[in-house]
Regions:
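Positively charged n-region of N-terminal signal peptides that target proteins for export
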Residues: 1-7
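Bacterial N-terminal signal peptides
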Residues: 7-17
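Flexible, processing/modification-adjacent segments and terminal tails
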Residues: 19-32, 39-42, 91-157, 178-184, ...
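N-terminal mature ectodomain segment of secretory-pathway/periplasmic proteins
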Residues: 21-100, 135-136
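Residue-level detector of beta-strand face positions
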Residues: 47-51, 75, 93, 139, ...
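Short amphipathic beta-strand/extended segments with alternating polar/hydrophobic composition
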Residues: 61-65, 84-89, 102-111, 163, ...
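Gly/Pro-enriched, hydrophobic low-complexity segments
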Residues: 79-81, 145-235
Length: 243
């Protein structure tokens, strides 16, 4: 009986080891397909410009600025109005003309979301240090292509990431997201990858819900390692001076 239990333990340990190796292999190939961790981490700033299209027919022009470590800013223009959301690594804030037009600091939930957007590498790079738990749960068909499905868990929140089995690039993320004031299960679909400073980046991201495209972001210009001062992300001074 003791020998049987020992044998079973070895089988379980062996299966766990193989599974861990499979996950590590997928992550390694995904990082290599993007250009490798060295190239990914060599990008210190990103300035991305493009158009955001909504299901209701609205279109907004935007400039998205990201800087290491943990700084993010999104500037949008719509019908002559300028809307800003930003995070300086500690404080998340926004300016919205439809909500009074004054800079306002955001709550803890918004800080958490903005911190995720400020992560230039994505959750699959240094995932353990960032507090994620990853599990390779199998494969799935994504628009006719096989993709590896990775379950990602952090702070009781779960999402699923799909890595294309041929290109090894991120094809899709399934997660919960706030849409028009309500939480919904959405698909974030990534396509049209192009080289930026030796790193493959998607030039198109679509957010789908119940099979319908709710929003798409098309990037027309992406510049890496441009000079962006930290003040660009800081909460505006009380006199309203724009930074």
């Amino acid at each position: 009986m003791r020998n049987l239990l020992a044998a079973l333990a070895l089988v379980v340990i062996g299966a766990t080891s193989v599974f861990a190796i499979e996950l590590d292999e997928v992550l390694a190939k995904a990082a290599a397909a993007r250009g490798g961790e060295k190239a990914i981490k060599s990008i210190s700033t990103l300035v991305q410009e493009g158009t955001m299209s909504m299901a209701q027919g609205m279109e907004l022009n935007f400039t998205q600025t990201t800087k290491r470590p943990s700084k993010f800013r999104m500037d949008m223009s719509f019908q002559g109005m300028a809307i800003t959301q930003a995070f300086d690594g500690t404080t998340a804030w926004s300016v919205n003309p439809m909500a009074g037009g004054k800079p306002e600091k955001a709550g803890s939930e918004e800080v958490k979301k903005m911190a995720e957007q400020a992560d230039m590498d994505g959750e699959l790079i240094d995932w353990q240090k960032k507090g994620y738990k990853l599990e390779l749960v199998g494969t799935e068909d994504i628009d006719g292509s096989t993709a590896y499905k990775i379950k990602s868990t952090k702070d009781d929140e779960t999402s699923f990431l799909y890595i294309d089995a041929v290109t090894w690039l991120l094809a899709k993320i399934d997660k919960k997201m706030s849409m028009m004031g309500q939480e919904a299960e959405v698909e974030m679909v990534f396509s049209n990858y192009q080289d930026v400073n030796g790193v493959q980046m998607p030039m198109l991201m679509e957010i789908r819900s119940d099979g319908q495209t709710m929003m798409s972001m098309s990037y027309s210009s992406v510049k890496a390692n441009v000079d962006v001062p930290d003040a660009r992300f800081a909460f505006p001074a009380e006199d309203g001076t724009k930074k």
